[in-house]
Amino acid sequence: MKILIVGAGIAGPTLAYWLLRSGHEPTLVERAPALREGGYLVDFWGAGFEVAERMGLVPRLMADGYRVREMREVSNSGKRIAHLNPLRVIDGAAAGRFVSIARSDLARATYDSLDGQVETIFGDTVDEITETEDHAAVRFASGAAREFDL
C-alpha cells in the first residue's frame, strides 16, 4: 500500500519505519523545509524505549543523550532549596532503560533509521484529501497532486 504520513517529527518516521518493514510504501510530508532543530530535553523510557530497542536505536540514543545526575531548585540568591537525582528515581524504576535526550536528536535518529528508503516531501503540507472507493486523492498546499491507498 502507498501510505501518506503527515509529519516528519518523531511519530511519523517511526510509523514509516514499521510500515516499510511490513511491505508498504510510506511517504512523509513535512511542513518545515527540513527536519526541525531544537526543542526540549525529554526523558525517554517505558514503551518508547522499548520501540527504540526494537528499531536498533538505543546505542545511538544513549550516545546522543544525557545522564542528568542532579536537578536543583535554587533561590534568587543561588542557594539550593531542593534537589533530586533522577538517575536514582527513574533509572532504578526503568531498570537502566532510560535516557534524557534533546527532542531534535530523537527525531533525527528515528528519521535516519529510514536509511533513505522513504520519500520525504519537505516544505509542503496536505491541503485537501478526496476519498474514493480505491484511493485517496491528495492535493498539497504547493498545488501538487498525488494518489495514495491510505
Regions found by a protein language model. Name each.
Residues M1-A11:
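Beta1/beta-strand and adjacent pyrophosphate-binding region of the FAD-binding site
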Residues M1-I3, F49-L150:
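Conserved N-terminal helical subregion
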Residues A11, A32, D127:
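Adenine-nucleotide cofactor-binding loop residues
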Residues P13, Y17, A107-R108:
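Short, hydrophobic alpha-helix immediately C-terminal to the catalytic nucleophile
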Residues L15-H24, V51-R54:
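A short, Lys/Arg-enriched amphipathic alpha-helix followed by its capping loop at the start of a domain
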Residues L20-Y40:
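Glycine-rich FAD pyrophosphate-binding loop
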Residues P33-E53:
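Conserved N-terminal glycine-rich FAD pyrophosphate-binding loop of Rossmann-like flavoproteins
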